[in-house]
Amino acid sequence: MAAPGARRPLLLLLLAGLAHSAPALFEVKDNNGTACIMASFSASFLTTYDAGHVSKVSNMTLPASAEVLKNSSSCGEKNASEPTLAITFGEGYLLKLTFTKNTTRYSVQHMYFTYNLSDTQFFPNASSKGPDTVDSTTDIKADINKTYRCVSDIRVYMKNVTIVLWDATIQAYLPSSNFSKEETRCPQDQPSPTTGPPSPSPPLVPTNPSVSKYNVTGDNGTCLLASMALQLNITYMKKDNTTVTRAFNINPSDKYSGTCGAQLVTLKVGNKSRVLELQFGMNATSSLFFLQGVQLNMTLPDAIEPTFSTSNYSLKALQASVGNSYKCNSEEHIFVSKALALNVFSVQVQAFRVESDRFGSVEECVQDGNNMLIPIAVGGALAGLVLIVLIAYLIGRKRSHAGYQTI
């Protein structure tokens, strides 16, 4: 989904270097030549891909040559299809937006991106070849008969891809063949209160979460074994326009389910007010598994937008060799988006290959290794002190015996 703010320091660095070019204009018209979708925006695409035994990041912007792909775009047919804007560019690249509406609002319900790993200009030395398609929901929405307007960056996180739109003007279900004068501005563009920026409320932190145990089984046996305590750190705007950060614990009593696949293992944990989905992927080349995706759908009754949703499918956390288990006693913070951080405590997890429903050999996190340095250093210092005292004692004893020698 769309979420303001960067996911990782690497993304911040790359995004800072983007040249914000002038936005392009795209139109979809019906059979009578009347526009039903208009969109003007600039865009960039950051894609993580495997190149041998390393991961690389490709960075491209929407070129001026991008154009509407007419045979994949439509105004939608009543009760049959959704209005769709498809934009093609480069050698096999496609950005597609599908729209939906209710009685008061319309939205970009889904965004799809197809990229070409055979394009050596942007994906040199890519391990895989050919096209790949990823998708995500978005937070792009506006009132009916109003134009959606967002000057600020809009980030949409997909599997291995982050799409950034800026200087965006979008409208579907047009009442005329032009943008409406009235606008719905995105939350990122909203001005700060004239009384000065409010101090964020201190995090409302509950007690540390309890450890929960999860076991996901498929046709071929157990594909996920996990023991961990999870906590959600969510930042959102309340109805009184103040920003708060709250912590919500995932409880052992929450129900869970999951799926087993050859390349993807999922775990869903939830209750009546929230569903958290964790996706574990696998790099077949390096034989590593890792947490690659997090999606959260939750209800926040005191928020301006009570329905909270965010996701990120470009993560690489909780990583270990397939057949082994990842273990970390230290608290870990996984930044999913600007609005969500996932705190993980006392974790041990193993995905894809689990034998006899037991954890395999342990691969410890770096944090636990660093924590061991302190007791080792203290132990070394104490051993050195004992050695010095022992040497001093032996020297003193030797001198004492020398004073009683027979003349």
Curated annotation (Swiss-Prot):
Molecular-function GO term, any one: enzyme binding
Cellular localisation: Lysosome membrane; Endosome membrane; Late endosome membrane; Cell membrane
Disulphide bridges, residue numbers: 36-75, 150-186, 223-260, 328-365
Region Hinge, annotated ranges: 190-219
Sequence ranges on the Cytoplasmic membrane side: 396-407
Glycosylation sites: 32, 59, 71, 79, 102, 116, 125, 145, 160, 178, 215, 220, 233, 241, 271, 283, 297, 312
Pfam family, one: Lamp2_2nd
Entry keyword set: Cell membrane, Disulfide bond, Endosome, Glycoprotein, Lysosome, Membrane, Signal, Transmembrane, Transmembrane helix
Record-level GO BP terms: autophagic cell death; establishment of protein localization to organelle; Golgi to lysosome transport; granzyme-mediated programmed cell death signaling pathway; lysosomal lumen acidification; positive regulation of natural killer cell degranulation; positive regulation of natural killer cell mediated cytotoxicity; protein stabilization
Region (Disordered), start-end ranges: 180-211
Positions of transmembrane segments: 372-395
Topological domains annotated Lumenal: 22-371
Biased composition (Pro residues): 194-206
Post-translational modification: O- and N-glycosylated; some of the N-glycans attached to LAMP-1 are polylactosaminoglycans.
Annotated stretches, region: Second lumenal domain: 220-371
Endpoints of the signal sequence: 1-21
Similarity-based family: Belongs to the LAMP family.
Role noted for this protein: Lysosomal membrane glycoprotein which plays an important role in lysosome biogenesis, lysosomal pH regulation, autophagy and cholesterol homeostasis. Acts as an important regulator of lysosomal lumen pH regulation by acting as a direct inhibitor of the proton channel TMEM175, facilitating lysosomal acidification for optimal hydrolase activity. Also plays an important role in NK-cells cytotoxicity. Mechanistically, participates in cytotoxic granule movement to the cell surface and perforin trafficking to the lytic granule.
Name this polypeptide is given: Lysosome-associated membrane glycoprotein 1
Chain's gene name: Lamp1
